[in-house]
Every structure is written in structure tokens, then in C-alpha cells.
């Protein structure tokens, strides 16, 4: 009985002695780095501090001592320790240090040494802080991409408003986010606003189209002669004589395209009014476009060869509105295009006729230049021949006869 009580007391004493060490070891998170040691020479200049080495039996005891030590260099807590497994009994093998940052304590390889870093008390480096900021930014982006936290998106009428973060919460999150994340958020907001503007513009265009659809049936019952003749009179008044270019054939294609494009909205209007034929409303639109294109080409196309052309195609449009307006308008347009093509062919043939004349004039000038050059060369050769002959005669020695000598002797005697 006494032996049991003594053993129980010893066990309680051992448990009470080991409890603080185990709790200290559990509270300290460590990172083990084997076979490395601190470069003391370069670390001293960066602020590393340490205590005197002590002897401990195991590495766990050294970790516990580092966790409980908070008086390095006065008030610094231990956050880095080195345990030397090569030391024998009674020799100091546990080294406790305070390191300001990871960069301040560079490591170098060393066999038999184990280095431990306390993660709990170790200061955060720039890499860790940037990683933390990145995770915060990703959280902001994820929160911003949710429909409740999107400030630039407006819900249409009749739909429930999304619930989520308030405006103040979003503004506070934006203020804490990094600069590049703010730019990314702004880009998302603008991309969300663009579909809204497009839908708004489409909604504005729809009432205007409806208004035009309501206005067009009112003008359909009126006689088409008044609508078609008015722009034609204006054109004939402003174009006397009308000036057209060789490039008018291009406008004929645009007339056909405009005819095809203007036909579709008018047919939709006439579908609502079954009593009104679609051809009567189609004719003034086409003639109006043709008149506009004629005036536009006359005023803008001011370059090139201008020729006069009488105005045609007005009489066919003033016929009876009950019979084939679309066919008469198409025939007038085809007549115009045919006349324009004839004009283009005539202008092209005139330009082709002028081409040989210009080539003939060029060849005449060429031969004239060659003849002038040959005459100059000929005169140069003649001049050189005469000059050479004079030089030869001057250098050639004359042969004197007896009479010449006699005369010279007489003159000498005199």
C-alpha cells in the first residue's frame, strides 16, 4: 500500500514537471532545417542577437527553451535555435537567437547541425506580406464578380434587386485593395456598363421605329405623284445642266442597295394595313433616294472630266398609282443605269482616242531630240576636223625652192 502511494506521488511529480515543457512545445510551431547553420559574420551586421549556448539532452528540450526565452538582448524573444548533434555530454549544444527577419539571417550548409525557426514569433517578410495582399485581392475579385457586389450593373425594372455587400463595404474593400486590382475592378465595371448602354440605345431606337411605323400609313393613301415629283422638280431646278462623272456607275449600285434596304421597313408597315398595296408605298421611297443621290453626286464629285447630261426618268413616276409602281420605278432606275453606262463607255472611248495622240506626240518629241543630238555631234566632229587640219599644217615643215632662197637673199642684202 505504501509502495503504491509512493509510486503515485512520483508519477504525479513527473507529470507536473513535463506538463509545462509539452505545453510550451505545443504552443510553438517550428520549421526544421537540417544540415544548415547561420552565417554569423554576415548576420551580425543585420541585427541578429543571441544568448550564451547551453547544454540540453534532446532537441525537444532546446525547442522548449527557445519558446520560453524572451530576454535575448533585453526584451527580444527567441525565434531561431540551432542544435548541435556532434557535441558530447556536458558541452553546450543549444544556441538561442533572435533574428529580425529571414533575410537578416542567411544560412549555409553544415553537417551535424539542425536549425529550427519558430513560425509563431518570426516576423513576416516582404514575400509573405505580398502573398497575403494577393490573397486579399483575390478575395476582393471573387466578391466583386458576384452579382450582389457588382456596383456598375443596374437591374431592370420589374426584377428584384440583388442582395450582398453595401456601397460602404465595397468602397472600403476597394480602398484596401492594391492598385492593379483596383484597375482590374474598374475595367470590369466598364465592361458591365457597356451592355447596359447598348440595351438602352436599342430601347431608345424601338420607340422611334414604332413612331415611324405609325406615321407611314398616314402618308400611304396620298397620291404618290406629289411625293415623287417634288424632289424631282428640285433636282431639275438645281441641276441645269446636270454634271455627272464617269464614276456614276458606282452610284447605280448604291441605288439598288438602297432600294433593297428601304423596301423591308415599308413592307412591314403595309402588312398591318391589308387594304393598301405594298407597291404604292414603295415607289416614293425609291424615287426619293434616287433624287438624293443625284443631288449628292452633283455637288460632291467635282474632280475629273465633267459632261452635261439631260435629266431623265421623271415621266414614268407620275403614272397611275394602281398599276405597277414598283415595275416603273425599277425600269426608270435601269434606264438611268444604262444611260450612265453608255456615258461611261463614251468617256472611256474618248480617253482611248486621246491615248494614241499622246503617244504619237511623245514619239515625235523623242525623234526631234535624237535629231538635235545627232546634229550637235556632227558639228562637233566638223569643228574638230578643221582644227586638226590647221594644227597639222602649222607643224608641217615647208620645202623652199632656189627662187625662194634667192628672193630671201636679195631681201637680206637690202
UniProtKB/Swiss-Prot annotation:
Residues 32-116 form the MANSC domain. The chain crosses the membrane at residues 370-392. It is found in: Membrane. PROSITE patterns: MANSC (PS50986). Keywords: Glycoprotein, Membrane, Signal, Transmembrane, Transmembrane helix. GO terms for cellular component: membrane. Residues 326-338 have a biased composition (Polar residues). Residues 311-339 are annotated as: Disordered. It is a single-pass type I membrane protein. Residues 25-369 are extracellular. Residues 393-414 are cytoplasmic. Glycans are attached at residues 128, 234, 335. It comes from the Eukaryota. Pfam families: MANEC. Residues 1-24 form the signal peptide. This is MANSC domain-containing protein 1. It comes from Mus musculus (Mouse).
